[in-house]
């Protein structure tokens, strides 16, 4: 740090003028007393253009990085809080949700919150996920226990043949035809999205439609409130770039929609014939069939 700046920090501290306005004002007066040739090119050029500024942002934050107590004083004088809850409207394009934020939807309003401020988002010490509006404790960190979630190809390879575990997913595909089941293997991102939401405590009901030779998936939630945690959102948004992902509400049911914008580039070899035989042998209960039919009617109303 330049000698003139460091000495002036001591001056500001000793005189008790440690607020951000005083810091900038004092440092600015100190910099003006330095010969023009000793100033940085950026500050000099701004003064030549007739702009008036206390000090450059680079110098200001350099000071705060060396004197943390001044940074604390600066934060205390801020009038606008850094962490806020932002109201969102439906339908919501989830790509507009900034990293580090979660989404909470309820009959009382919809908001995007900072993950570390949210009581429903998992923490390292006490990882929880939300099922509806109720937190559900998980055994260990979801990502540590499911490293495959970081890769669509790996997750699909490990789960495509687990037909019983993903019974609802495959029965919903089969409600169209076996050809649609085979078509889903060309879009591994669909099973991946369903797996991510199940891993983070949700009970998703996937409903499929076909458009331009590709499958669109709408995941329905049978809850009065829906919380999409920051980690789940980042996994979906970062690993599914070929899908437009949005959240909406229809007939008091929340829907997360996955619309393909480009064909999936990942080509994962799985035993298609064996999987299709297992899917054909699945038992579809009357309750499951009714849920799929009602879900299809709801999706058609979107």
Swiss-Prot record:
GO MF, any single term: zinc ion binding
Annotated signal peptide: none
Keyword annotations: Host membrane, Host nucleus, Membrane, Metal-binding, Phosphoprotein, Zinc, Zinc-finger
Any matching Pfam family: Herpes_UL31
Chain residue ranges for the region called Disordered: 1-22
Source species, domain of life: Viruses
Bias (Polar residues) ranges: 1-17
Annotated localization: Host nucleus inner membrane
Zn finger residue spans: CCCH-type: 102-227
Transmembrane segments: none
Function: Plays an essential role in virion nuclear egress, the first step of virion release from infected cell. Within the host nucleus, NEC1 interacts with the newly formed capsid through the vertexes and directs it to the inner nuclear membrane by associating with NEC2. Induces the budding of the capsid at the inner nuclear membrane as well as its envelopment into the perinuclear space.
Subunit structure: Forms a heterohexameric complex with NEC2. Interacts with capsid vertex specific component 2/CVC2; this interaction directs the capsid to the host inner nuclear membrane to initiate budding.
Family the UniProt entry places it in: Belongs to the herpesviridae NEC1 protein family.
HAMAP family: HSV_NEC1
Protein name: Nuclear egress protein 1
Gene from which this protein is expressed: NEC1
